[in-house]
Each structure stands twice: as C-alpha cells, then as structure tokens.
C-alpha cells in the first residue's frame, strides 16, 4: 500500500496527527513560548487580580479584570497554535525539471569539439501589475519560484510570500499574535500598576511601601516592560511593512538594491489585502496517498544533441563508408591488373613472383588503405575484403599449377 505524502516529505517539517498539523523543524520552541505567556498570567491571576478584586469589591470591578486577563490569554494562545500548525504557503516541489524551459547551450571541450548541452535558465521574466519582475529557478524544488517566493533554508521549502522563518509561520495570524501579545503585556503592566496605586490609596503609604507589600506586581511590571520592547517593536515594524505591502526579506533587499516596490497599492488597499482578502487553500494535501508517476518518454541527460546535428553526423558517416568501399574496389582492380601482367612472364620468374605475391597478399590484406583511416567498416566492407583475399588466392593457385605443367 502506498504511503502518504507527509511520510515521504522532503522538507524539514514535523507532522502530527497523521499529517493534519504541520510544524517547522524548530517546533520544540512552541511549548517554550506557551510557558513564556502562561507563567506571567498565572502570577497575575493569583497575586494581582485576586487581591485587586478584593480591594475593589464594592464595585465588583475586580472580577472583570480577572476574567478579561484569562480570556485574552486564551485568545493569544489560540493564535499561536493557528500560526504554528498551518501550512504557511509551501509550493509543491517538482519531481523533475520543467521540460518546456529546457534550452541548448554549446560548450567546447578540450579537444575542440562542440557539444550541445541541456540547461535551464537561472532566471526568467514575468509580469506583475504591468511591470517585469525577474524570478529565479530553485535547484532544490526544481521549479521557478513565483513572485515574492523564496526558499527557506531552515524548513527546506519554497514558501509563497516568504517573510522570515520563526515558530509563527503564517503572516496574517503571526501579526495578530504579536499584536495581541503586545496588548496583553500592556494590560498586565497596567493592572499591576493599578494594584500598587490602590495599595497606596488604601493604606496612605508611599510608592515604595506599596511595592514592598506586592513584590509580584513589581516583577510582573518589569517582565512586561522588557517583553514589550520585543513584541511591541515587532508589531510596529510589521505595521510599516503592511502599510507598504512588503515582507521583511523584500524590505532589506529593496533597500540594498534601491529597487522599486511594485506591490505597493496604497496604505488602505495594502491593509485590506493583508487582513480581508480570502486565504488561498493549501497547495499540498499532506494526507493524500502518493501516486506513482508514469514512465517518462524523454530522459533528461547531461549532454544532448540536436536532431539536425545527429542527421548531419549520420550522413557524414554514410559518406565516409561509401568512400571506403570505393577505395577497396580500386585496390581490387590494381590487384587484378598486376596478376594479368604477371601471367605472361617467364615461368621461373612467375613462380618466384607468385611466392612473393603470396607473402604480399598476406601482408596487404590487413593493411588496406581504408583500414588505416577507419577502424570499423560495415558488413559490406568486410565482405568485400574477404572476397578480394579469396579471389587472389585462387588466381595464385591456378597460375602456380599452370607453371608446373609447362615445366
């Protein structure tokens, strides 16, 4: 029985629940991220929100702070799970290079012979919004990458609209996650500061005295302040990228190459495209069974010959074979003329000539002029050579017998 696609996947992804969930090779960091989110919220619920509920008991506002913190934390964790377990837009790789893109290139070898080879252009031009954009060929996936697609060296896949590799792999949900995490940090920081303010008002003390009474609130404020620099800065940077319709990779590349961003269609349209456009279905069915490909008629090789060049080489070979046959016929005629001239000579001398001819014929047979130039004749050339040697031997035998009778 054929296996499923995720079982033979060539990328570095990790699959769970029979290919229903797909993670990156660094999926181990997801539980660690969960702990970084859940741990401060637990301390906030036990040491801040509970006491804040008691201090604000007459107004029943403390329950709202506790429930809001827990629900918002659950929302952030759901976003983290959605962004880390979904297909980020992996482009299916090909099993062989695209044949329609093959082109011939002539290379000159060390002996001076030109050999046509098959090559695939490294880049090609495509039109995007009326502007020509160059796309590259991926040797690993054996395809031309679509516009805004790059090959991720960590997960070993070509990913559409590749931004950067991190545990949160889908861009829309990734932005919602970091922005929600930013709001959660601000919320916990604000509630911890509010709790210290309530302690100051109720006990008529100073800030330092209130901080000593609730050290957990101070620790949460420090933790959220440090985290806010990371997730808050990341949220602000990606707000800029969304407003200009760029990815992190494109931002650095355009800045270094001074290239024009052809995808920028205005701030409002860019935000609409990011958050309101329909999410395309995945190109991969990881749970599907592997289908065996039919045998291909064309076999790709490192060296190819053009059809017209192959025909020209065959014609040259046939022409050379005809020339070899003509050379053999010429040698046969000369040998017959020599035998006819020697038949009218003296008997004694004729006998000596016949003996020499035997030796000469044995030496000449394998050293015909055409053999020196071409090591292999055809079946016709070999047959004619055997006829010449056999005919010369018969004539020599008859001449020798006639000479013996005359003596």
UniProtKB/Swiss-Prot annotation:
Disulfide bonds: none annotated. Residues 136-179 form the DHHC domain. Pfam families: DHHC. The keyword Acyltransferase applies. The active site is at residue 166. Coiled coil: none annotated. InterPro entries: Palmitoyltrfase_DHHC, PFA4/ZDH16/20/ERF2-like. Residues 300-407 are annotated as: Disordered. Mainly expressed in seeds. The chain crosses the membrane at residues 28-48, 62-82, 174-194, 217-237. It comes from the Eukaryota. It is a multi-pass membrane protein. It is an enzyme of class 2 (transferase). Keywords: Acyltransferase, Cell membrane, Lipoprotein, Membrane, Palmitate, Transferase, Transmembrane, Transmembrane helix. Residues 346-356 have a biased composition (Basic and acidic residues). It is found in: Cell membrane. Palmitoyl acyltransferase. Belongs to the DHHC palmitoyltransferase family. This is Probable protein S-acyltransferase 9. It comes from Arabidopsis thaliana.
């Amino acid at each position: 029985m054929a296996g499923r696609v995720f079982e033979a996947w060539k990328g570095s992804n990790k699959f769970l629940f029979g290919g229903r969930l797909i993670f990156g090779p660094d999926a181990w960091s997801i539980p660690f991220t969960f702990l970084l989110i859940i741990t401060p919220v637990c301390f906030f619920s036990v040491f801040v929100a509970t006491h804040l509920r008691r201090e604000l008991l007459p107004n029943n506002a403390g329950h709202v702070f506790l429930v809001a913190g827990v629900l918002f934390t659950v929302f952030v964790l759901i976003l983290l799970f959605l962004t880390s377990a979904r297909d980020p837009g992996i482009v299916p790789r090909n099993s062989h290079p695209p044949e329609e893109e093959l082109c011939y290139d002539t290379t000159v070898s060390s002996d001076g012979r030109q050999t046509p080879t098959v090559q695939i252009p490294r880049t090609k031009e495509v039109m995007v919004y009326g502007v020509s954009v160059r796309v590259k060929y991926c040797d690993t996936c054996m395809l031309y990458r679509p516009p805004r697609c790059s090959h991720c060296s960590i997960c070993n896949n070509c990913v559409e609209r590749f931004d950067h590799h991190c545990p949160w792999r889908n861009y829309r949900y990734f932005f919602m996650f970091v922005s929600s995490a930013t709001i959660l940090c601000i919320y916990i920081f604000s509630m911890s500061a509010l709790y210290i303010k309530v302690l100051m008002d109720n006990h008529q003390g100073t800030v330092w005295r209130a901080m000593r009474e609730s050290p957990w609130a101070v620790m949460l404020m420090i933790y959220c302040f440090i985290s806010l620099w990371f997730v808050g800065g990341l949220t602000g940077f990606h707000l800029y990228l969304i407003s200009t319709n760029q990815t992190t990779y494109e931002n650095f590349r355009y800045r270094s190459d001074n290239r024009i961003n052809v995808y920028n269609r205005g701030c409002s349209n860019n935000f609409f495209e990011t958050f309101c456009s329909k999410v395309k279905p995945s190109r991969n069915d990881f749970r599907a069974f592997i289908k065996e490909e039919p045998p291909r008629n064309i076999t790709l090789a490192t060296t190819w010959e053009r059809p017209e060049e192959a025909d020209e080489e065959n014609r040259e070979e046939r022409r050379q074979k005809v020339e070899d046959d003509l050379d053999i016929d010429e040698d046969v005629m000369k040998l017959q003329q020599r035998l006819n001239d020697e038949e009218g000579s003296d008997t004694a001398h004729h006998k000596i000539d016949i003996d020499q001819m035997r030796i000469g014929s044995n030496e000449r047979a394998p050293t015909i002029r055409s053999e020196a130039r071409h090591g292999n004749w055809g079946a016709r050339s070999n047959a004619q050579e055997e006829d010449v040697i056999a005919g010369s031997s018969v004539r020599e035998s008859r001449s020798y017998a006639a000479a013996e009778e005359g003596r």
